[in-house]
Amino acid sequence: MAPNPRKSHPLLKMINNSLIDLPTPSNISIWWNFGSLLGICLLTQIMTGLLLATHYTADTTLAFSSVAHTCRNVQYGWLIRNLHANGASFFFICIYLHIGRGLYYGSYLYKETWNTGIILLLTLMATAFVGYVLPWGQMSFWGATVITNLFSAIPYIGQTIVEWAWGGFSVDNPTLTRFFALHFLLPFLIAGLTLIHLTFLHESGSNNPLGIISNCDKIPFHPYFSLKDILGFMLMLLPLTTLALFSPNLLGDPENFTPANPLTTPPHIKPEWYFLFAYAILRSIPNKLGGVLALAASVLILFLIPFLHKSKQRTMTFRPISQLLFWTLVANLLILTWIGSQPVEHPFIIIGQLASLTYFLILLALFPLTGALENKLLNH
């Protein structure tokens, strides 16, 4: 029999083992679609970003007008920009749902896959932040000023780090140039980390909604899940194009229609919606260093999740108390997102503080306690 190049060629063999003949649990649900959706998001962002970079000028005097020029004079420049800006939102929607799936179904017990995933999240957050600064609108400038300034809370070396990051004594031309360089570079780092993430995943194979070993019941990835993934792509790209074509500025900040001006501060400085939960946690602590530590902890706490798993069952499928707690956490994050968009005044301050406390309480104390309680209930 003639050798099949798909199974013998060194490169095709890797693709075959990852995307075609990959043994996949037969019962994985639509929640397992988000990994491939994140891959499509990354590809879309790199392609649209590359096209935007060809028309962008990383200079404080020209950045704003170069973006306006792209939208007005470049063929379909407006569409490319709208897809890129809103694509970031969809990227974060997918990654948050992907992490939520991991939490609910105990996928974090694949520690290497989980940890590389968190590093991917942090890299994505950094990429989105530096990218937001590039159009050089008011909120871009002041967002960059406020967030980079947080590093000055680090004792002794903080101020030096900030001035080193800025390339001067304030956010200016050197800052914009290096942010553009970073924004161009980081997506390729994300692509590399994704391959590591997948390598670790394929060491163990996918988890499934029951959280049990599924070696006895696996099916090939293609055609079953490749087809299911294509359906997922369509279901994501349709709302993305709808948003980009009908209301591209829905999720943006109106302040960014004003060119950056270091002399006037916007009334409410706030980041894009996908960072609002962390921003609310930052603001809920009246001390600068305390706020920065809470902000860092709000994301880095994910590294602790595998060690806080006390249940005998992997997933929450048959754990109703943990399910209730999980959805409480989701509601809590939505409240934090809303609070982050509100001005710092009563009653928003106290709501934000309570929601921040509840966030850490659920993850650090209530999840492990509930797991232990459910183990006890199983024995009776």
UniProtKB/Swiss-Prot annotation:
Any single GO BP term: mitochondrial electron transport, ubiquinol to cytochrome c
UniProt-listed InterPro entries: Cyt_b/b6_C (IPR005798), Cyt_b/b6_C_sf (IPR036150), Cyt_b/b6_N (IPR005797), Cytb/b6-like_sf (IPR027387), Cytochrome_b (IPR030689), Cytochrome_b_C_euk/bac (IPR048260), Cytochrome_b_N_euk/bac (IPR048259), Di-haem_cyt_TM (IPR016174)
Positions bound to heme b b562: H84, H183
Gene Ontology molecular function: metal ion binding; ubiquinol-cytochrome-c reductase activity
Transmembrane spans: 34-54, 78-99, 114-134, 179-199, 227-247, 289-309, 321-341, 348-368
Localization terms from the record: Mitochondrion inner membrane
Cofactor note: Binds 2 heme b groups non-covalently.
The keyword Transmembrane is annotated on this UniProt entry: yes
Cofactors named for this entry: heme b
Residues involved in a ubiquinone binding: H202
Keywords associated with the record: Electron transport, Heme, Iron, Membrane, Metal-binding, Mitochondrion, Mitochondrion inner membrane, Respiratory chain, Transmembrane, Transmembrane helix, Transport, Ubiquinone
Topology with respect to the bilayer: Multi-pass membrane protein
Any one GO CC term of the record: mitochondrial inner membrane
Superkingdom: Eukaryota
Pfam families linked: Cytochrom_B_C, Cytochrome_B
Binding positions for heme b b566 per the UniProt entry: H98, H197
Family per similarity comment: Belongs to the cytochrome b family.
Role of this protein: Component of the ubiquinol-cytochrome c reductase complex (complex III or cytochrome b-c1 complex) that is part of the mitochondrial respiratory chain. The b-c1 complex mediates electron transfer from ubiquinol to cytochrome c. Contributes to the generation of a proton gradient across the mitochondrial membrane that is then used for ATP synthesis.
Additional remarks: Heme 1 (or BL or b562) is low-potential and absorbs at about 562 nm, and heme 2 (or BH or b566) is high-potential and absorbs at about 566 nm.
Subunit structure: The cytochrome bc1 complex contains 11 subunits: 3 respiratory subunits (MT-CYB, CYC1 and UQCRFS1), 2 core proteins (UQCRC1 and UQCRC2) and 6 low-molecular weight proteins (UQCRH/QCR6, UQCRB/QCR7, UQCRQ/QCR8, UQCR10/QCR9, UQCR11/QCR10 and a cleavage product of UQCRFS1). This cytochrome bc1 complex then forms a dimer.
Name of the molecule in the record: Cytochrome b
Organism of origin: Buteo buteo (Eurasian buzzard)
Source taxonomy: Eukaryota, Metazoa, Chordata, Craniata, Vertebrata
Gene this chain is encoded by: MT-CYB
